[in-house]
């Protein structure tokens, strides 16, 4: 069955409909420094990335939805049309990679993590924020996205961590706060 292109339809209105929660907590988790490059995968309109624009001038938003990226471009962010399973960057290109409320939308979770790990520099950090599938709100999101025919599969943080069995993982942890989960993975320097 063909999937409806929700994100290109929502592009011009997305920021108005969905506000960013916990931006100060996220900025602290990511721990971006001025000379570091940040990649926001599935970053759409740049609503998350713009919180880092005062810290670093090397911020890229990668997303397959062109209309979402147009909104990010209006914010002065560097944009690239890309799927998470085939990132058009050289190995070890970014000190920080974030994927906020997007991991459950990808078609191939393991391939996405493999690609992220490939473009993440040694000493870099990956931060994934997802709905907490064990919370009633996370379950409602999963049901709602299924009803809307979205290609979504919300994964528990332990399963995401088990997919990150890379040789050069230095530190891996997750934080659960009611409806949200953050998975943070540091790559050995």
Where do the PLM segments sit?
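Short catalytic micro-motifs in class I SAM-dependent methyltransferases
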Residues: 101-102
């Amino acid at each position: 069955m063909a999937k409806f292109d929700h994100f290109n339809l929502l592009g011009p209105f997305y920021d108005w409909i969905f506000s960013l929660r916990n931006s100060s907590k996220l900025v602290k988790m990511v721990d971006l420094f001025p000379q570091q490059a940040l990649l926001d995968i599935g970053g759409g309109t740049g609503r998350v990335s713009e919180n880092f624009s005062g810290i670093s001038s090397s911020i890229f938003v990668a997303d397959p939805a062109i209309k979402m990226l147009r909104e990010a471009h209006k914010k002065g962010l560097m944009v690239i049309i890309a799927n998470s399973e085939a990132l058009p960057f050289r190995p070890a290109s970014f000190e920080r990679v974030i994927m906020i409320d997007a991991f459950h939308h990808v078609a191939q979770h393991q391939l996405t993590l493999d690609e992220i790990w490939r473009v993440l520099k040694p000493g870099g950090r990956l931060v994934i924020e997802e709905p907490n599938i064990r919370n009633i709100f996370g379950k409602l999101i999963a049901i709602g996205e299924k009803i809307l025919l979205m290609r979504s599969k919300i994964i528990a943080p332990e399963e995401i961590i088990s997919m990150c069995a890379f040789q050069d993982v230095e530190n891996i942890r997750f934080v659960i706060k009611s409806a949200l989960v953050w998975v943070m993975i540091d790559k050995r320097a």
